[in-house]
Amino acid sequence: MTANTSRSTVLTGIGTLVTNDPTVGEGPLGLIRDAAVVFDGGVVAWVGSADSAPAGDVGHDLDGRAVLPGFVESHSHLVFGGERAEEFAARMAGQPYAAGGIRNTIEATRNATDEQLQANTRRLLDESLRSGSTTVECKTGYGQTVAHELRSTRIAASLTDEVTLLAAHVPPPEYAGRADDYVAMVCSEMIDACAPQAKWIDVFCETGAFDRDQAHAVLTAGMAKGLIPRVHGNQLREGPGVQLAVELGAASVDHVCYTTQADIDALAQSSTVATLLPGADFSTRNKYPDARALLDAGVTVALGADCNPGTSYTTSLPFCIAIAVRDMHMTPDEAIWAATAGGARALQRADVGVLRPGARADVLALDAPSYLHLAYRPGVPLVSDVWRGGELAWSAHTGHEKARALR
């Protein structure tokens, strides 16, 4: 225990503990059976067999439940106004997805008050917490003027440390046919204004959004201001997004539904994470990424929910885990790792997505004896308790909830 006045917590009665640390447990997930976890001062102090657990000031007997690191959501778009349920219904009736739908959200976001945007973002973060996400990245991208993007970055930064400037989402309506002019504005006054509130710079490198040269300009302008690059790429067809991400050393390239062997090889030889977003492919009836080919080649894979009002209005990583196992041919172990340690890799974080001494005490317990149930029982709300920074943030059994700023 640490020599301070904090109260230590010990979780006992853990049926299966996922640590994601193979040095302390079995296999890549570092599994420990009949386990215990101790946290103190907001960090993990000890993990191991329950019969060797040190005493804590506060104890919780989990009665055989499985325990995992909190999910790490590395891709979300939570600052927006309105919704697009009618667009979803039309798409399900056979109309193809087009990026133009984003422009409907741009209008609704611009028309929303600060209070409305803040409340909606909090609501979605609360929802994410209830499904087990304890670290959430949040993108802008629905304001697309300097003032509106600055407002979005400020709202996001008030709620999470993982803020991404996605000003280059699609060219806004007032820049129709003038994407280069919009890019020039993003690369100058918009990044200048928003960079102090953000950590990441992102771009949608896709036909109908921004081409390779435009995406390169946005990313390098952000990098010049200290932002770390991420890329939306290869979602709708093969394209330059993957190769651009690797070239610039991006933390991740997200979607990657359409890849060549050269794309897969480039990712395998790089540190760029491939973040797969099955919720978007489910909701648009798009082709799922070839996760098996990526994993077999040695690519680091993360899973994200991609919560947004147009193409993936879900905050549930358990739902995405089930899809990844059923339709993307990932094993349950691979999907769990991708939603925890993989998301942490995509955010370049070593303190989350893992349960080992010194890691942040972000922990979730399931109403199930094994983590396998997350894929085995799709659609069932299995997350029973969530601790964030060592504090009980939500419990299905008590209704206890403290889902606020993700600090």
Curated annotation (Swiss-Prot):
Q: What class of enzyme is it?
A: hydrolase
Q: Which residues form a coiled coil?
A: none
Q: Where does N-formimidoyl-L-glutamate bind?
A: 142, 308, 310
UniProt KW keywords: Cytoplasm, Histidine metabolism, Hydrolase, Iron, Metal-binding, Zinc
Molecular function, one GO term: iron ion binding
UniProt keyword annotation of Cytoplasm present:
yes
Q: Does the keyword Iron apply?
A: yes
Purpose of the protein: Catalyzes the hydrolytic cleavage of the carbon-nitrogen bond in imidazolone-5-propanoate to yield N-formimidoyl-L-glutamate. It is the third step in the universal histidine degradation pathway.
Give the similarity note: Belongs to the metallo-dependent hydrolases superfamily. HutI family.
What this protein is called in its record is Imidazolonepropionase
Species of provenance: Rhodococcus jostii (strain RHA1)
Q: What is the lineage of its organism?
A: Bacteria, Bacillati, Actinomycetota, Actinomycetes, Mycobacteriales
The encoding gene: hutI
